[in-house]
Regions:
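Short, solvent-exposed secondary-structure boundary/capping segments
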Residues: 78-89
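Short, conserved beta-turn/loop elements at beta-strand boundaries and strand-helix junctions
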Residues: 34, 75-80
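A short macromolecule-binding patch
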Residues: 30, 93-98
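Short coil-to-beta-strand transition motifs
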Residues: 21-24, 61-69
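N-terminal helix initiation/capping motif
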Residues: 1-32
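Conserved hydrophobic positions within beta-strands
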Residues: 29, 70-72
Length: 98
């Protein structure tokens, strides 16, 4: 059953390279789903902490901001950077200011 859950989760994720604003730090989203995100950053984070971030999306209608809050569920050292997996618990989307 665990394999089916992992396969289902993988099917829902979208590989990407979107800028992430971490409120004083920057990162790059490498994959996104409706319930989570994985991003790389130079900043350090702790497993279990709450994190707020904004993903910048260039949509056909203009620049959109996906503002999220979530729980850090995994940390992966990646050379000089760190990979952070977040389970999104709250999100809103809005147009960016011109």
């Amino acid at each position: 059953m665990v394999n089916r859950d992992r396969e289902k989760r993988r099917g829902e994720r979208i590989s990407t390279a979107l800028p992430v604003d971490l409120g004083g730090a920057r990162g790059v989203a490498l994959d996104v789903s409706a319930s989570g995100i994985f991003f790389e950053t130079d900043s350090s984070y702790a497993l279990g902490n709450l994190v707020s971030f904004t993903v910048e999306i260039n949509a056909p209608v203009g620049k959109m901001l996906l503002k999220c809050q979530g729980d850090i569920v995994r940390i992966e050292p990646r050379g000089t950077r760190v990979g952070v997996a977040v389970k999104i618990i709250e999100s809103t989307m809005e147009f960016a200011s011109p």
